[in-house]
């Protein structure tokens, strides 16, 4: 267990600088203080070893968090950079219930499914939480044959009896379209990625439905597929802009990839946002990823949702449940400065 310098300093009422000098074997600290620091480290290590021993004695098996990579267009970045805070919380939750926590990435193109299934059987894995955004229904069949509880994140295999924890994509897109229409926009175009996954399919269906409900025309003719990388989206968006914007006053941006690629093309042409073109995005972006643009955003919850799914899986291991559930997490609309209120200025 790695103990942070600031935690040692706080526990021993020393300055972080003093602790750093001791740990790096630097001069300037008296022997009594050095001894206090090293004694504390030994004490913490003994306590940690005892904790591990107790956990091993009480261990009921392992819970696996499995990220399933089909093509890598959506989950590749997550797989390469796991969310440490989420995994720390999941590991703690599993430990409290007497289970080990394990994280694994399966690449469909290069991995061997039979080896993965054999490994799951041999490792005393009691349940699996799937990061399943890229999966299709047939992908889940081999795992169902393991006859252990599973919970699905970011997908829906309801008819197969698998519980799911999802962002309410339809509610989010409805919220976004309504926001634009209420601001006076009707010529709205939906910018999409090329890949078909569950989350995107739900968003596209909701766009078509809400455009019809709000009497804004046929949404199927207002959908433009641009690509699956920021560069591909940027190039396709430039080609679209070369043909000029015909009546279009607002774009709904399907994902962070679309947002980054499309806004780059728009801003390079000095198109004024929001006066000439309004934008509303789906999914959060890193801070300052688009300098000078405060994007209006439809935001889902991810960390809390996946942690709740893991807690539900643990309950499934201890309680008999006959019902199949699907839990939708509502989105939030975060107002930025990227949507022009046409109604406010209609008479100006």
Protein language model features and the residues they cover:
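Flexible loop/turn connectors
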Residues: 240-348
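Short, well-structured alpha-helical segments in soluble
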Residues: 111-125, 233-247
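Amphipathic helical "hinge" segments at domain boundaries
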Residues: 46-116
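N-terminal helix-turn-helix DNA-binding module of bacterial transcription factors
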Residues: 1-59
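Hinge/beta->alpha junction and helix N-cap segments in small-molecule ligand-binding domains
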Residues: 71-85, 103-111, 165-175, 191-238, ...
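Flexible loop/hinge segments that line or gate small-molecule binding clefts
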Residues: 131-172, 257, 283-295
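Short acidic capping loops at alpha-helix termini that bridge into adjacent secondary structure
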Residues: 186-187, 218-221, 273-279
């Amino acid at each position: 267990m790695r103990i942070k310098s600031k935690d040692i300093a706080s526990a021993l009422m020393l300055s972080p600088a003093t602790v750093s000098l001791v740990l790096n074997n630097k001069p300037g600290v008296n022997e009594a203080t050095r001894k206090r620091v090293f004694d504390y480290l030994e004490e913490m290590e003994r306590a940690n070893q005892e904790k591990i021993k107790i956990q091993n004695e009480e261990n009921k098996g392992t819970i696996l968090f499995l990220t399933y990579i089909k093509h890598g267009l959506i989950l590749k970045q997550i797989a390469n950079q796991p969310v440490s805070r989420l995994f720390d919380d999941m590991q703690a939750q599993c430990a409290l219930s007497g289970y080990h926590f394990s994280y694994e990435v399966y690449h469909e193109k290069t991995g061997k499914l039979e080896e993965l299934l054999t490994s799951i059987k041999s490792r005393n894995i009691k349940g699996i939480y799937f990061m399943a955004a890229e999966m299709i229904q047939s992908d889940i069949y081999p795992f169902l044959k393991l006859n252990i509880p599973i919970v699905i994140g970011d997908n829906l295999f309801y008819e197969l009896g698998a519980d799911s924890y999802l962002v309410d994509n339809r509610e989010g897109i409805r919220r976004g379209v309504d926001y634009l229409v209420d601001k006076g926009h009707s010529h709205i175009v939906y910018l999409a990625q090329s890949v078909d996954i569950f989350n995107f399919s739900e968003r596209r269906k909701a766009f078509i439905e809400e455009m019809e409900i709000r009497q804004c025309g046929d949404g199927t003719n207002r959908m433009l597929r641009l690509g699956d990388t920021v560069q591909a989206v940027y190039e396709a968006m430039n080609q679209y802009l070369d043909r000029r914007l015909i009546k279009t006053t607002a774009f709904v941006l399907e994902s962070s990839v679309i947002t980054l690629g499309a806004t780059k093309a728009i801003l390079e042409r000095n198109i004024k946002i929001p006066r000439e073109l309004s934008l509303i995005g789906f999914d959060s972006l890193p801070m300052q990823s688009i300098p000078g643009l405060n994007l209006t955003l439809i935001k889902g919850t991810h960390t809390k949702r996946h942690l709740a799914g893991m807690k539900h899986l643990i309950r499934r291991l201890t309680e008999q449940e006959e019902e199949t559930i699907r839990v939708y997490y509502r989105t939030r609309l975060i107002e930025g400065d990227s949507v022009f209120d046409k109604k406010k200025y209609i008479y100006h």
